[in-house]
């Protein structure tokens, strides 16, 4: 009998790249299923154990996802930067499932901000001890292959890594979002559909290091149909502060996104007020309101299926994953009820946002 995670998450065909933006409350976790020779590579970009506001318990979900599967391990864990809302629960995850390879930004935040960083170091050692890949992501002009997908590492640039590494710990920590990994992953031919994963990358990162270098030359490597909103819909993608008189939007001119995914709880539930109203207004200048998808709205996870010809659909799970795997309101320590919840109890039908191809 399949688990609910398998029913909802596993792609129905081997020639579909599936991208799942999971509801993890105040944090990020994006799961990729990447076609590769008749099977799928799996990649989890960032993680958060959103115990408040019913976030999905990633440990239970991932255990159920890989239970009884021939490919019973996570092929890649990718960390855009070592903040707890992007590397939360990492010790629990690596104890619960096998992780073959790890990619990361190479940021060392210093001893006063080391909890997520230390968990990442433990994973790096565990992976390398088994002969897996431990890769520090560095921005490059190259387009690389991953299974049957293509990808670009857009950030951090080598000179940014070197410069920030020479700073004292507190300055390094303040610049962590400038040092954030940014990746674009695409699938389909002749023109791939691209998903742009931005982590918490900020105005400085885009204005000073990413946009012109990767977007304004002969090849636009930031153009993407699906944009994951940076920093949970924070204004920091556009502004240095709320009263910044010169919001930066050049990156949006070149990304040209058709769809936006915001990973955050409801604004009134967010400890930072995400997504920020002024950021939403800027996004709406480029993206129609009905193509802006917010995980906090109904505690939904959004599922993007990209086909081999580049067409794609974005659907949602109707909040089913959060209902089935979400932390209960009184859960303080991340316990859960996997034994009571993990098995499927009936057929599952995904909610269609729009049955017409979106790309």
Identify the residue ranges that each predicted region occupies.
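Active-site metal-binding loops of divalent metal-dependent hydrolases
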Residues: 24, 45-50, 82, 107, ...
């Amino acid at each position: 009998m399949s688990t609910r995670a398998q029913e909802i998450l596993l792609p129905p065909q081997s020639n579909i790249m599936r991208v799942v933006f999971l509801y993890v409350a105040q944090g990020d976790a994006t799961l990729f299923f990447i076609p590769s020779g008749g099977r799928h590579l799996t990649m989890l970009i960032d993680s958060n154990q959103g115990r408040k506001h019913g976030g999905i318990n990633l440990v239970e979900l991932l255990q159920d996802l890989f239970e009884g599967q021939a490919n019973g391990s996570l092929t890649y864990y990718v960390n855009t930067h070592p903040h707890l809302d992007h590397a939360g629960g990492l010790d629990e995850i690596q104890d619960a499932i096998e992780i073959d390879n790890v990619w990361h930004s190479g940021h060392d935040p210093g001893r006063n901000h080391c909890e997520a960083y230390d968990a990442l170091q433990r994973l790096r050692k565990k992976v390398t001890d088994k002969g897996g890949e431990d890769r520090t992501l560095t921005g490059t002009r190259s387009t690389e292959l991953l299974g049957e997908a293509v990808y670009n590492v857009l950030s951090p640039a080598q000179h940014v890594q070197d410069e920030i590494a020479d700073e004292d710990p507190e300055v390094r920590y303040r610049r962590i979002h400038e040092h954030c990994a940014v990746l674009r992953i695409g699938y389909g031919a002749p023109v791939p559909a691209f998903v742009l994963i931005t982590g918490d990358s900020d105005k400085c990162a885009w204005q000073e290091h990413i946009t012109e270098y990767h977007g304004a030359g002969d090849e636009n490597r930031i153009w993407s149909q699906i944009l994951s909103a940076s920093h949970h819909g924070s204004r920091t993608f556009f502004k240095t502060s709320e009263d910044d008189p010169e919001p930066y939007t050049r990156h949006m001119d070149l990304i040209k996104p058709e769809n936006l995914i915001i990973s955050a709880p409801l604004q009134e539930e967010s400890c930072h007020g995400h997504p920020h109203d002024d950021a939403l207004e800027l996004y709406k200048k480029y993206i129609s309101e009905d193509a802006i998808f917010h995980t906090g709205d109904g505690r939904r996870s959004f599922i993007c299926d990209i086909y081999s010809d580049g067409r794609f659909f974005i659907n949602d799970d109707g909040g089913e994953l959060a209902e089935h795997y979400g932390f209960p309101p009184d859960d303080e320590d991340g316990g859960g009820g996997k034994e009571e919840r993990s098995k499927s109890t009936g057929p599952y039908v995904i909610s269609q946002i729009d049955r017409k191809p979106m790309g």
